[in-house]
């Protein structure tokens, strides 16, 4: 079990039947002043979503990489406030933000953005109906996206097809 505790990321052994002090992992995981929102483990990496961007820590090399929004780079994160992180059945990392979803490309070490607006005021069909993404859930080849005001979006990873579900009062 990975937790945010005292400005860092620690591990608690689940086998212990009592509350215990978290195990210190690495000084690289000390993140003072960083508002951590979500932690996700993928193989030998820990992905940390925060209000200050995304951190990816490699447990073998003990190296930390910090990803942030860059207005001059369309392959950077779409926004720095990370609301959720999930892994698809194809082992692709998805990063939810207040401005859409970001698909991590391990080959290029950058992101593909999925959001409502192209940036030119044009609304794209078959995409998110709200950029403010609260949560992600992956179920095989399906990605469920919970949004702030757009309701639930159902994405198919293979075709990046999005279906929108929302309440009409």
Protein language model features and the residues they cover:
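Carboxylate-rich, polar loop motifs that coordinate divalent cations or form catalytic acidic clusters
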Residues: 1-169
């Amino acid at each position: 079990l990975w937790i945010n505790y005292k400005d860092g990321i620690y591990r608690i052994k689940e086998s212990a039947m009592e509350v215990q002090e978290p195990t210190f992992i690495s000084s690289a995981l000390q993140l003072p002043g960083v508002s951590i929102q979500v932690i996700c483990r993928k193989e030998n990496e820990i992905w940390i979503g925060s209000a200050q961007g995304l951190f990816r820590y490699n447990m073998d090399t003990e190296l930390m990489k910090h990803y942030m929004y860059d207005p001059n780079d369309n392959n950077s994160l779409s926004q720095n406030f990370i609301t959720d992180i999930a892994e698809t059945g194809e082992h692709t990392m998805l990063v939810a933000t207040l401005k859409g979803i970001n698909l991590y490309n391990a080959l290029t070490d950058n992101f593909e953005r999925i959001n409502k607006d192209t940036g030119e005021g044009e609304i794209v069909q078959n995409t998110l109906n709200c950029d403010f993404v609260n949560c992600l859930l992956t179920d095989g080849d399906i990605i469920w996206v919970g949004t702030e005001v757009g309701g639930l979006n159902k994405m198919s990873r293979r075709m990046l097809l999005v279906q929108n579900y929302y309440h009409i009062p």
